[in-house]
UniProtKB/Swiss-Prot annotation:
NCBIfam families: PRK05710.1-3 (NF004314), queuosine_YadB (TIGR03838). The gene is gluQ. Its cofactor is Zn(2+). The keyword Nucleus does not apply. HAMAP family: Glu_Q_tRNA_synth. Pfam families: tRNA-synt_1c. The keyword Ribosomal protein does not apply. This is Glutamyl-Q tRNA(Asp) synthetase. ATP binds at residue 229.
Length: 297
């Protein structure tokens, strides 16, 4: 794990406006970076055009600015980085660590959707997968969720790096960019906890050092499901950011009294940095609706 100066990031996908769960991840990652005296960077993960919403990235950046969360460097857009992903993929193909595959989801259904061996001949539509040998396990110590171990071979199988439709897979793009940006600490929602073992396997194949990981609890809506754009979660109000900012502070387990009753966004964040305690972060995978923006102070 990295011994370099702390460098964190927040990396939303432009599929809609930021909701309260997004704000929690942004604020949590920002506070941890500031607490460590490090940098915090913003990356727009716009590698899936069919899911992207026009103007969403601009609105997301506007919302972050309204909440006083500014990137410590230029915003990186994954849509500008095809050449870097192609270079990494070529290395893996040349070394035999990756291979082309035309197996469809329907064809893999009989194997539980897990790919170990190709069951279809190569066709025009070809994905590229990372070869995951038998007995491949990945284990890491999450700073909040504890020790996580996964048998990547039996539970995941060969990992898609480039989809059959030509779009880059999340796993490849995030590993390449975290390494290129020198990210030492990945702080994100617990919905991505399951992705981490396969990213560790890919990092090893590419010869890059893994960052440290901390997965914040998810915010669940009144229906018990994760707040998400796909479930029509309400966007945070960037015209009146203080209520949501205070609610996110509480959801991170921090003492409400640490923030001044009357202050600007900048003033609230200044006090937040001074009084933030990582030890108070909730050591759970999810939080119920009581911690949402409408929770009492």
């Amino acid at each position: 794990m990295s011994s370099l100066p702390y460098r964190g990031r927040f990396a939303p996908s432009p599929t809609g406006p930021l909701h309260f769960g997004s704000l929690l991840a942004a604020l949590g990652s920002w506070l941890l970076a500031r607490h460590a005296g490090g940098e915090w960077h913003v990356r727009i993960e716009d590698i899936d055009p069919p899911r992207a919403e026009p103007g969403a990235s601009e609105r997301q950046l506007h919302t972050l600015a309204a909440f006083g969360l500014h990137s410590d460097g230029p915003v990186l857009y994954q849509s500008d980085r095809d050449a870097y992903y192609e270079a990494a993929l070529s290395r893996l193909l040349r070394s035999g660590a990756a291979f082309e595959c035309s197996c469809s989801r329907a064809e893999l259904a009989a194997m539980g959707g897990i790919h170990h061996v190709c069951v279809a001949p190569l066709g025009i539509r070809r994905a590229v997968r990372l070869r995951v040998p038998p007995n491949t396990q990945a284990s890491f110590q999450d700073a909040l969720q504890g020790r996580i171990t996964q048998d990547v071979y039996s539970e995941v199988g060969d990992v898609v790096l480039r989809r059959a439709d030509g779009y880059w897979a999340y796993q490849l793009a995030v590993v390449v960019d975290d390494a290129a940006q020198g990210i030492t600490d990945v702080v994100r929602g617990a919905d991505l906890l399951d992705s981490t073992p396969r990213q560790l396997v890919l990092q090893q194949a590419l010869g890059v050092a893994p960052p440290r990981y901390l997965h914040l609890p998810l915010i669940l809506g009144a229906d018990g499901r994760k707040l998400s754009k796909s479930h029509a979660a309400q966007p945070v109000d960037d015209s009146d950011p203080l209520p949501a900012l205070r609610a996110a502070w509480r959801a991170l387990g921090q003492a409400p009294a640490a923030l001044p009753a009357r202050a600007s966004v900048a003033g609230v964040l200044q006090h937040a940095v001074q009084h933030f305690s990582p030890q108070r972060l909730p050591r759970v995978a999810s939080l119920d609706a009581a911690t949402r923006i409408d929770a009492p102070a």
